[in-house]
Amino acid sequence: MRRPLGDASALESVPLKLIIVAAVATMSVLPAAQALAGLENREFARRAEVQLDLIVTTAQVLTVQGPGNVRTINLDFMSDGSLQLDRILVGGPAGGVNSSSVRLVLNNGAVMTRIAQDPTCAICSPSMTGLVLYQASMELRMAAVLENRTTLIIVEAL
């Protein structure tokens, strides 16, 4: 009778090979999950920056167009990663330090800020204060009004 070619103990080494493959696969799962979470956070930060720019640009367009003009914009700050929206601070009292800014506060304490300049605009809520928003998805109504010979952009969540 002929002997099979190759290693006679090949069958005995299969469990060892399977254990090695399982160990390598297990060690690569955590870095892959961390890479995915990092990608989700970067994608959220990029989308958040674009939406903050949209708020500021809309306020600037309304300032140039003048009183009586209105725009409605949809915002979506939803995130699947660990980085999440805490709140959005829009404008402030006319003439105040934050009257031309939009700030996004993240759950880790970081703040993204956009300032409306060139042209500068005064952005506030209907009560003439800053607007604080907590929703991750919302619709904003922005209207240009004349107040004491100054064009203000009134922002409210719908």
Model-found features: residue ranges?
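N-terminal leader/signal peptides at the extreme start of proteins
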Residues: M1-A10
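Short amphipathic alpha-helical patches
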Residues: R2-R3, T26, R42-R46, A59, ...
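C-terminal juxtamembrane segment of a hydrophobic transmembrane alpha-helix
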Residues: V14, L18-N41
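Membrane-proximal N-terminal amphipathic helix
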Residues: A37-N69
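Short, glycine/small-hydrophobic-rich surface segments
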Residues: L62-Q84
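A generic structural micro-environment signature
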Residues: K17-A22, R42-A45, G68-N69, G81-L83, ...
